[in-house]
């Protein structure tokens, strides 16, 4: 639901958009932490209104995929949820959407790096290592103004600082006749509960308590896998 916390989570941002969306709106996301949050929060109300590229974790599919979906569904609003990491890898189809008059609504959830991989590092008993900008060993850390960047490609855009501002911005985006990009800073460590075993290994010979616990959980999950499938 709505929140007044300083940095909202991915789930808060997705929920804000969902509450103000139309049943015919199509949600698109891929890779990173957004897929898990969108799948739990976004409950489709019509057929063919939820596109999640999950299996191959194709970072930067979000905007390009949304463009293709918009071309196939010109009378529907297509909403792309994208993290800052995926956005930086590939974003030029914002320009493509503008010059071909295929309006998209793009929600950039900026959590300061590749936060889901940072989460994986910690869950597997490791320490933070160059996945979040603030914990990286960089001599000149500068932020990216995603709103201005999108505007330079012809999109309308704005930076918002709260969930209530996000909801109002989304209403403006719905009325826009050109691609509309909304950027919001989100929490780097806050995720929804609910997960399943993922066979992503850790150290076989642990050298810290964190590694030891990660190996224990890994083996417990491995023991529950179906054999020969």
Please describe what each predicted stretch is:
Residues 1-47, 53-55, 91:
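Cofactor-pocket helix-loop regions in the catalytic cores of large enzyme subunits
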Residues 36-37, 41-229:
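Thiamine diphosphate
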């Amino acid at each position: 639901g709505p929140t007044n916390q300083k940095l909202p989570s991915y789930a808060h941002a997705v929920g804000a958009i969902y509450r103000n969306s139309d049943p015919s709106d199509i949600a698109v996301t891929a890779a990173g932490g957004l897929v898990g949050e969108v799948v739990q929060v976004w409950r489709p109300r019509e057929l063919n209104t939820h596109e999640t590229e999950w299996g191959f974790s194709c970072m930067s599919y979000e905007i390009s995929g949304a463009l293709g979906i918009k071309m196939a569904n010109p009378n529907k609003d297509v909403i792309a949820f994208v993290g800052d990491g995926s956005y930086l890898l590939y974003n030029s189809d914002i320009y493509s959407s503008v010059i071909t008059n295929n309006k998209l609504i793009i929600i950039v959830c900026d959590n300061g790096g590749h936060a889901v991989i940072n989460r994986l590092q910690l869950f597997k008993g490791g320490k933070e290592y160059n996945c979040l900008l603030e914990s990286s060993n960089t001599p000149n850390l500068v932020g990216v103004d995603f709103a201005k960047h999108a505007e330079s490609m012809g999109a309308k855009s704005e930076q918002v600082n709260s969930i209530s501002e996000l909801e109002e911005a989304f209403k403006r985006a719905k009325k826009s006749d050109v691609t509309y990009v909304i950027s919001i800073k989100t929490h780097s460590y806050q995720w929804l509960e609910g997960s399943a075993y993922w066979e992503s290994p850790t150290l076989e010979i642990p050298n810290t308590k964190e590694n030891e616990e990660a190996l224990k959980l890994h083996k417990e999950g491995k023991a529950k896998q179906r054999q020969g499938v």
